[in-house]
Amino acid sequence: MKSILFVAFAATVSFLALAPAVAQQSQIMGELRFSSPSKAVRDSGVWIDGQYVGYMNELKGDNKISLLPGDHEVAVRQAGYKDYTKVIVVEPGQVRFLTVEMEKDPRAVYPTDRNAAELKLNIGPTRAAVFVDDAYIGHASDFGGYRIMVVSAGKHVVKVELPGYRTFETEVSPLPGQRTEIKTDLVKGGIEQAGSLIKQQ
């Protein structure tokens, strides 16, 4: 009986000791929240200090961005748009709001009807970043279900990356008018096993 009481007491003391530490940490950390008037932009990938953290529309609630106080570089990328980059200052315990507006990239090249091919992705987790020929295209759920990716016919290297998972890479060579499906579930791994594309500036 004494041992049970001791364990219960020890657990209570540990919890009480942990609570102030958690509260103190929440007071130190700042939060970053995004907004954009464009639905397309809200689906863009977000990098903070060179690390991919997810797509904009999911970075809230349980997936909110908590940052240490100080300067941080934010990059937002979307296929067909110029990269948006900004250095922000995060204050302790404060919420930093960032409104993102992106410009369409006039250099973007789109496949013509004659040489267009389709890629359909069935990938988990669906929040993983997708790159085609090292260019960020979107997150996996953008190209699942009834949605497809249109690429030019010919050889392409497709990479799928997410922090905490091993990078998936495959090569496809679709013909004009052909639909190719890529199906995989990423394997969990350490952050050091993540590919360089989700860490790039």
State the predicted function of each range:
Residues 1-6:
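Positively charged n-region of N-terminal signal peptides that target proteins for export
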Residues 7-17:
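Bacterial N-terminal signal peptides
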Residues 21-201:
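Short loop/turn and low-complexity linker motifs enriched in small/turn-promoting residues
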